């Protein structure tokens, strides 16, 4: 399947002025998705951070890395992530997402949930530095 197969029709999953979700089913074929997961696991210099919840410091049950302009950072829950420059393969993926979506993306938080015990509870990504109504692409 061509990555930009014109048969891909976005499906709107929510109403306007709420969390708007557009879903492109089968945007990647299984082989390409498997390659991207493998490359992510092996090539990203993953961070393991801790978070303070109800007075306890615990490891965040996932690994993560923040990509973007190296002069920028992202802070949530008192965790400051200094941006790492996009590797070429993630930058190419970002460009493909921009073409498909018609939107621009300048940074990426990449998460690695290692197994069934890694997870993050329901939460709001409402940091002011993300701006009003931030746009998120999720793969």
What residue ranges belong to the model's regions?
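Non-heme Fe(II) oxygenase metal-center motifs and adjacent flexible, charged/small-residue loops
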Residues: 1-138
């Amino acid at each position: 399947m061509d990555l930009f197969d014109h048969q891909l029709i976005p499906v709107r999953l929510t109403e306007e002025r709420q969390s708007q979700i557009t879903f492109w089913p089968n945007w990647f074929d299984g082989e390409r998705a498997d390659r991207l997961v493998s490359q992510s696991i092996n090539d990203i210099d993953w961070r393991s951070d801790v978070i303070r919840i109800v007075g306890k410091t615990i490891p965040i049950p996932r690994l993560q890395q923040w990509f973007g302009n190296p002069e920028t950072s992202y802070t949530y829950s008192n965790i400051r992530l200094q941006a790492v420059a996009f590797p070429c393969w993630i930058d190419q993926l970002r460009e493909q997402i921009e073409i498909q979506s018609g939107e621009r993306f300048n940074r990426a938080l990449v998460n690695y949930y290692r197994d069934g015990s890694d997870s993050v509870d329901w939460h709001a990504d409402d940091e002011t530095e993300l701006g009003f109504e931030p746009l998120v692409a999720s793969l």
